[in-house]
C-alpha cells in the first residue's frame, strides 16, 4: 500500500478534471480525495496498491482530454492513512 500527494497544473479547473480523476480512481480502486486550490492547480491525495497507484499517476500525468490539459504533476509520497473511498472535496 502506498499514498501520494499530487499537485497538478495546467488547464485543470473549470473543465471537469476533478470528476475525471474521481472516475479513474474509482475504476482503479484508489481511495483519497481531489480538490481545487486557489492558485488554479488541483491537489490529489491518493492511496492504493503500489503498482496501481503508479499507473494512476501516469494516467493523470498524460491526460489530454477535451479541455483538460495536464502540464505538470508534482508527486510526494506520504504515510498511508487508510482512506475508504475517493471523494471530491470542496474546501
UniProtKB/Swiss-Prot annotation:
Catalyzed reactions per annotation: an acyl phosphate + H2O = a carboxylate + phosphate + H(+)
Domain Acylphosphatase-like residues, every copy: 3-90
InterPro entries: Acylphosphatase, Acylphosphatase-like_dom, Acylphosphatase-like_dom_sf, Acylphosphatase_CS
EC number: 3.6.1.7
GO molecular function: acylphosphatase activity
Source domain of life: Archaea
Keyword vocabulary terms for this entry: Hydrolase
Active-site residues (renumbered): 18, 36
The UniProt record lists the keyword Hydrolase: yes
Entry-linked Pfam families: Acylphosphatase
Family the UniProt entry places it in: Belongs to the acylphosphatase family.
Protein's recorded name: Acylphosphatase
Species name: Methanospirillum hungatei JF-1 (strain ATCC 27890 / DSM 864 / NBRC 100397 / JF-1)
